[in-house]
Swiss-Prot record:
Plays a role in virus cell tropism, and may be required for efficient virus replication in macrophages. This is Protein MGF 505-5R. It comes from the Viruses. InterPro entries: MGF_505. Pfam families: DUF249.
């Protein structure tokens, strides 16, 4: 349980003016050589009614003086124990530092608060489980180059590599530069991997400086081709859209080849592409190759327009390939652009293929995008044996079954493809079966079947009329005349057989 004195010490915020030094000492609110202590708010203390400082600064001072009693008071006032430990280390009060450290058992949480390399090292030494490698790694993280310089000879090759990578990832440029200039690093090229990972051009520049000024012989010894390395970096940068990386790399060599530009196209980095297309005289074949890649990569409208502009929107040489890519990658953006810009029509060659395997929803959007009439879609669907599209598109045009029958019948009259015409008639008959037509409409449909030699459908509708006890002799005679006139011999035979039963 807390004593009354401890409760008072913790919670008293205002001391009366008449409180003398003796009473303050008895309450434990007195700091030798400084005077009375008074808590101000949550974060500050007032010393001898005169000086206001933060609780943590007071803790550091008390620790430096080795004043455990004041340290404990300030900790009750919710001060940070880290500052007390730092102060104890600064004042060489090791016993107090160890006593306080025993309450946290992790020196690494304190290190970011320390600026002095000597105190940094002393603080790290509080943790007996840590070694020199751990000290140096943390020193690098917190910009303590002098510690690295002091202990570099005690580090193994693996430790040096780890420290170098930590320095790169922590963006400690001075340490990275010093290590590259003064220590043999097993894999200095890791600096480039990290530079790209962090997209940090300063680190990339340091890497090139080290590569060409300090480790070029080492890299050649490892059979690494510098030009290939630079080209690889250009390709990476292009693929990531890092134009400033590319410009930095080009200061040291390399060339922006078609492979490099392909990376920019593949990931749709138009600004990179635009920058180098303006400055390089590429062959037309190369730009055509980039355009085809852009189609396959589903690049943006701006990227496609950019490449097309360098071809003056002329695609005669790659027309077939564009159609092939449009079908293979199921993209129509290039077709839209060419149609709107130069009225180049690539719709016809792909329409049949698209209708052959795309859904109604997709084709409805396609029809809207290219302002295609439904009649054209339905006829093409008939050619491609897509009855589902015929039904859905015709229903979209005509909601009422009777209107739909009339609409589809008109399409049959203008349909030249034999298989497509037969499918339309088949669809019409199915629609008729699902509808309730009056005899007058059924007569019209029977004549329609006769005109188009649809024997099965004609026989079916005549049977339906007979079941309703409707006299169809005149209809049969009329249709027989149509069949004779058009030389539909099988239909003639069908009509004559039907007449025999009437």
């Amino acid at each position: 349980m807390f004593t009354l004195q401890e409760i008072c010490r913790k919670n008293i915020y205002f001391l009366p003016d008449w409180l003398n030094e003796h009473v303050a000492q008895r309450l434990g609110l007195y700091w030798e050589k400084h005077g009375s202590l008074q808590r101000i708010g949550d974060d500050y203390v007032l010393i001898q009614q005169d000086l206001i400082i933060s609780i943590n600064e007071a803790l550091r001072m008390a620790g430096e003086e080795g004043n455990d009693e004041v340290v404990q008071l300030l900790l009750q006032w919710e001060g940070n124990i880290f500052y007390a430990i730092i102060g104890a280390l600064e004042g060489d009060h090791d016993s107090l530092a160890y006593k306080l450290y025993s309450q946290i058992r992790d020196c690494h949480t304190i290190l970011p608060l320390i600026q002095d390399p000597k105190i940094f090292e002393k603080c790290h030494d509080l943790d007996e489980s840590c070694n020199i490698s751990c000290l140096v790694l943390n020193a690098v993280k917190h910009d303590m180059l002098c510690i690295l310089q002091e202990y570099k000879m005690l580090l193994s090759g693996g430790d040096i590599q780890e420290v170098f990578e930590i320095a790169c990832r922590s963006l400690k440029y001075d340490i990275v530069t010093w290590m590259g200039q003064n220590i043999a690093i097993y894999n200095p090229g890791v600096i480039f991997d990290i530079a790209f990972d962090k997209m940090n051009v300063s680190l990339l520049s340091i890497g090139y400086t080290l590569l060409f000024n300090h480790h070029i012989n080492h890299i050649n010894h490892e059979n690494i081709d510098v030009n290939s390395l630079l080209t690889q970096h250009l390709e990476w940068a292009a693929g990531m859209g890092l134009l400033h990386f590319m410009l930095e790399t080009l200061k040291y060599g390399g060339d922006v080849t078609i492979i490099v530009l392909s990376a920019a196209v593949k990931y749709d980095h138009r600004k990179v592409l635009d920058y180098f297309l303006r400055r390089k005289n590429l062959y037309r074949e190369d730009i055509e190759e980039l355009l085809l890649l852009a189609i396959s990569a589903d690049c943006s409208k701006k990227t496609l327009n950019l490449l097309l502009s360098y071809l003056n929107y002329s695609i005669d040489n790659i027309r077939k390939k564009i159609l092939q890519y449009v079908k293979e990658y199921e993209t129509t953006l290039i077709i839209k652009i060419l149609w709107k810009k130069k009225k180049i029509n690539l719709i016809e060659p792909i329409l049949a293929d698209f209708i052959g395997y795309h859904s109604y929803t997709y084709m409805k959007g396609f029809m809207r995008d290219f302002s295609i009439h439904p009649e054209r879609i339905i006829k093409m669907a008939a050619r491609e044996s897509r009855e589902d599209l015929i039904i859905k598109f015709s229903k979209n045009v005509c909601k009422e079954p009777k209107d739909r029958l009339h609409y589809l019948k008109n399409l049959v009259y203008t349909m030249k493809h034999k298989g497509g015409k037969q499918l339309l008639i088949y669809t019409i008959h199915n629609l008729y079966k699902a509808s309730c037509l009056e005899s007058k409409e059924m007569f019209k449909l029977a004549r329609f079947y006769a005109r188009h030699d649809a024997r099965i459908q004609f026989k079916s509708i005549c049977h339906d009329l007979s079941k309703q006890n409707i006299n169809i002799k005149n209809l049969l005679l009329e249709c027989l005349g149509i069949a004779i006139k058009k030389n539909y011999f099988q239909l003639i035979e069908t009509i004559e057989m039907t007449m025999n039963y009437e």
